[in-house]
Amino acid sequence: MTYKECKYLIKSDLNRLTKVKWRGGGIKYLFFNASFRITFWFRIGSYLARQKGILFKLLYGIVFLIHKHNQYLTGIQLPIGTQIGEGLCFAHFSCIVINSTALIGKNCTIYHGVTIGGVRGPKGGAPIIGDNVVISSGAKIIGKVRIGNNVMIGSGAIVVKDIPDNAVVVGNPGKVISYNGKDHIQYFVN
């Protein structure tokens, strides 16, 4: 990841929360908005972890500690280096666990109590989540499953099978109840 890419990801995460520019209020969000604070330090840490040189390693150590502290404050386990696209938004926080090997597309909205977890063993793996996905409170996405684009996962749903594009999923186990997810997520993504 280049510095320019890191900066773009940070700005797109901020734009999911507000339309203020970085200099016009982004710093305020860094101090007072838990969602932006956790994603900011996650992006900076992910950038520094891929850099070479003693100065970058020293800075990474400091950022790692800041990020770890923010994980404790927010209750969001977001490992540095996890591959997550632009526009990540935690609408509410606490009790959120994201596997470090999960792949998450752009404009993902995650509510409290969500688990995006992997499974060990020969059939193991972690979820691959598409673009413009809303994961409602208490939902669990477990194992090597693919979640399509424009998907809405309802509160408390437990997803252990692949979900196609534009689906709305509810229940335990998660079942597709409609294919108008694109209509539902427009209120969360824009």
Regions found by a protein language model. Name each.
Residues 1-74, 184-190:
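Terminal amphipathic alpha-helical/low-complexity segments used for targeting or macromolecular assembly
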Residues 180-182:
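Flexible, disordered linker segments and immediate boundary regions flanking tandem C2H2 zinc-finger modules
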